[in-house]
Amino acid sequence: MKNLRNRSFLTLLDFSRQEVEFLLTLSEDLKRAKYIGTEKPMLKNKNIALLFEKDSTRTRCAFEVAAHDQGANVTYLGPTGSQMGKKETTKDTARVLGGMYDGIEYRGFSQRTVETLAEYSGVPVWNGLTDEDHPTQVLADFLTAKEVLKKDYADINFTYVGDGRNNVANALMQGAAIMGMNFHLVCPKELNPTDELLNRCKNIAAENGGNILITDDIDQGVKGSDVIYTDVWVSMGEPDEVWKERLELLKPYQVNKEMMDKTGNPNVIFEHCLPSFHNADTKIGQQIFEKYGIREMEVTDEVFESKASVVFQEAENRMHTIKAVMVATLGEF
């Protein structure tokens, strides 16, 4: 644990395979301890700032519960809760918070912002999500897959279907490369990840005995998968023309029963970082249905509610894995 002490957690690419495996094993240990009532608080008297430029359910709750379980105090600063970027630079905010807090979580837009916080705060900074990356999510995704499939990480065939450029796709590809997984990214060519990231991940995968395949061929991409993973196709705030174009591009890549069957694996599981547009029972879901006639977007309700779906176990594991990151980088042993 000592080797991660005072480290920031900004992207999985900053960590070795052994370090990521350590965080996942620690997550298992902390989860087990919580379940059987033997958890020992290792963050006593630590003060943690949660800096959110984007609202969240799972990330905020996971950090707050994990910190509480471990004896830490938390201050939540929401989208209107600080002056960062408005009256105060990120560099200045970092130095202010670093003088008062032992650790800082950031969830927002730019990867450069979380990097600046880490550079100038003098305390561990944890990336709760940026437009480019989502490393804490991937720890939960991998832990869930191992728990359900009963396989070593390197033996898991992990497939992401959808927008290959988004933060979750980027983070999953990084994590899979580090862990030596067989990773398929199934997406339209127009939505491929950057060549720079893809080439870097392919090199890392080769070093760790893994493999990365990028394809727009759904049959080829999903065959043999242990995990089918998807994420939302569009984000609120994007212009209407982007929605229309994205929906047309991604409609064939909807995760449905036919796609799950194409894996040829009766034990395949479905993962999603949530929230999901699997029906029209939300305000945004209803707006999408009224405007585009689509009731189910990236995944059908049938798959989302099926036995193959492990999305709520995955959501719970956000808390256990985030706890592991905080304990490993800030804990007292």
From Swiss-Prot:
Does the keyword Cytoplasm feature in the UniProt annotation?
yes
Q: Top-level EC class, please?
A: transferase
Q: In which pathway does it act?
A: Amino-acid biosynthesis; L-arginine biosynthesis; L-arginine from L-ornithine and carbamoyl phosphate: step 1/3
Pfam families (alphabetical): OTCace, OTCace_N
Source superkingdom:
Bacteria
Tell me what reaction this enzyme catalyses: carbamoyl phosphate + L-ornithine = L-citrulline + phosphate + H(+)
Q: What is its main location?
A: cytoplasm
Q: Output the InterPro entries linked to this UniProt entry.
A: Asp/Orn_carbamoyltranf_P-bd, Asp/Orn_carbamoylTrfase, Asp/Orn_carbamoylTrfase_sf, Asp_carbamoyltransf_Asp/Orn-bd, Orn/put_carbamltrans, OTCase_ArgI
Gene3D superfamilies tied to this protein: Aspartate/ornithine carbamoyltransferase (3.40.50.1370)
Q: Does the keyword Transferase apply?
A: yes
Which residues make up the binding site for L-ornithine?
A: N167, D231, S235, M236
GO molecular function list: amino acid binding; ornithine carbamoyltransferase activity
Residues bound to carbamoyl phosphate are: S56, T57, R58, T59, Q83, R107, H134, P135, T136, Q137, C273, L274, R318
Q: Which UniProt keywords apply?
A: Amino-acid biosynthesis, Arginine biosynthesis, Cytoplasm, Transferase
Q: Name one GO cellular component term.
A: cytoplasm
| Entry EC number(s) | 2.1.3.3
Could you tell me which PROSITE patterns the record lists for this protein? CARBAMOYLTRANSFERASE
The places in or outside the cell where this protein is found are:
Cytoplasm
Biological process (GO) annotations held by this record are: arginine biosynthetic process via ornithine; citrulline biosynthetic process; L-arginine biosynthetic process
Function, in words: Reversibly catalyzes the transfer of the carbamoyl group from carbamoyl phosphate (CP) to the N(epsilon) atom of ornithine (ORN) to produce L-citrulline.
UniProt cross-references to NCBIfam families, sorted A to Z: orni_carb_tr, PRK00779.1, PRK04284.1
* Assigned protein family: Belongs to the aspartate/ornithine carbamoyltransferase superfamily. OTCase family.
Identify this protein by name: Ornithine carbamoyltransferase
**Lineage, highest ranks first:** Bacteria, Bacillati, Bacillota, Bacilli, Bacillales
In the UniProt record, what gene is named as encoding this protein?
A: argF
